[in-house]
């Protein structure tokens, strides 16, 4: 159920963002329009940064409360994560990887992932997909 909410949030942000042209895009965290979607966990919010009408790719900033877990899932396109605040743990079949603020993770398309905010404070991270971020639940 949480994954469905995440998918709804991502889709809603994508629709709200529209399709940028060839102009530069600048977003400052202190003035960004953070949005909380109905049904999302308390403290979960996001800001759509960019969508690509040709590829379906997108860039997104998200924040989740401490302890929040995103259940196992995979995407149809490659995903990049840069942790902006807090600590994110990436749980995979071959072990866990802790990504601290300033850290980076690359997840190839169709690789199963489970993410959790393992810091005592909220987690904030930048997400980028090079194609549509279609997400599918995994076991």
Enumerate the predicted regions with their spans.
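Glycine- and acidic-residue-biased ligand/ion/polar-headgroup-sensing regions
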Residues: 65-68, 75-93
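Short acidic-glycine-tyrosine-enriched beta hairpin
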Residues: 54, 93-112
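Ligand-binding loop in jelly-roll beta-barrel domains
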Residues: 44, 109-134
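A short, N-terminal "cap"/entry segment at the start of jelly-roll beta-barrel domains
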Residues: 16-56, 138-139
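Bacterial N-terminal signal peptides that target proteins for export
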Residues: 1-7
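Structural recognition of the beta-strand scaffold that forms the well-ordered cores
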Residues: 48, 72, 82, 106, ...
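Conserved hydrophobic/aromatic beta-strand scaffold that supports enzyme active sites
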Residues: 46-48, 59-61, 80, 96, ...
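Conserved short histidine dyad/triad with adjacent acidic residue
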Residues: 55-75, 108-110
């Amino acid at each position: 159920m949480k994954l469905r909410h995440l998918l709804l949030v991502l889709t809603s942000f994508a629709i709200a963002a529209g399709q940028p042209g060839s102009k530069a895009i600048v977003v400052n965290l202190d003035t960004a329009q953070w949005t909380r979607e109905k049904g999302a966990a308390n403290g979960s919010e996001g800001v759509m940064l960019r969508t690509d009408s040709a590829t379906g790719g997108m860039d997104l900033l998200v924040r989740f409360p401490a302890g929040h877990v995103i259940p196992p899932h995979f995407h149809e396109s490659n995903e990049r994560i840069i942790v902006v605040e807090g600590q994110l743990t990436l749980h995979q079949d071959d072990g866990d990887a802790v990504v601290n603020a300033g850290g980076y993770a690359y997840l190839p398309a169709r690789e199963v992932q489970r993410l959790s905010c393992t810091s005592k404070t909220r987690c904030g991270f930048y997400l980028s997909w090079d194609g549509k971020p279609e997400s599918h639940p995994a076991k």
